[in-house]
Amino acid sequence: GSSAASDVYKRQLTAKEIVNTYSESALADLLFAYGELRNAKKIASLIVQHRPDEIATTMQLNEVLRQVLPKGNEHKVLAKIYQSLRMEVNKEIDVLQSFLTQSKDVLKSGGRLSVISYHSLEDRMVKRYIQNGNFDSEPAKDDFGNPTLYFKKCGGLVVPDKEEIKQNNSARSATLR
């Protein structure tokens, strides 16, 4: 039988749909928020200008973006653009928020929460949540205005050393809190 959950997975947003249907401002917001790209508006504008012709492949998208890519640093900007698309398709920020919010309800008192994040946006969210019990920069407060801390920090930030990165290159951006 078909369940509501499996229907959600059948009809998943694709990067192709994002590139070809999101408004210029929605694309710019996405690229700025998830890719932390300062020239997000310029990139979004360029994508929208090429819309009469559908952008169906990564090669086509790379070609469209070529004129805004800094010489010698193309791969870094492209990585941030594709990261933004992946994060939107997979709803990664929503999933992380949901996970963190549920964690305080399922952890035993005195239990430990360890989270590995792979880029600064995720790490900032995790750090704020552990520090403040919410995703704002201000701590959650009880009825008397006292900070309500759900987590006690134990141990510091852990990042991979050179040897680990040599063995597993994808670990280079990982941060354990």
Label every model-predicted segment:
Residues 11-19, 30, 124-126:
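Conserved class I S-adenosyl-L-methionine
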Residues 1-5, 9:
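Single conserved hydrophobic/aromatic residue that forms the stacking wall/gate
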Residues 10-13, 22, 38, 56, ...:
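Short coil/turn linker and secondary-structure boundary residues
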Residues 6-7, 17-18, 55, 107-108, ...:
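Generic preference for hydrophobic/aromatic residues in regular secondary structure cores
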Residues 19, 24-90:
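Cysteine-centric redox/oxidoreductase cores and disulfide-bonded domains
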Residues 58-105, 112-177:
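C-terminal catalytic and target-recognition region of SAM-dependent MTase-like enzymes
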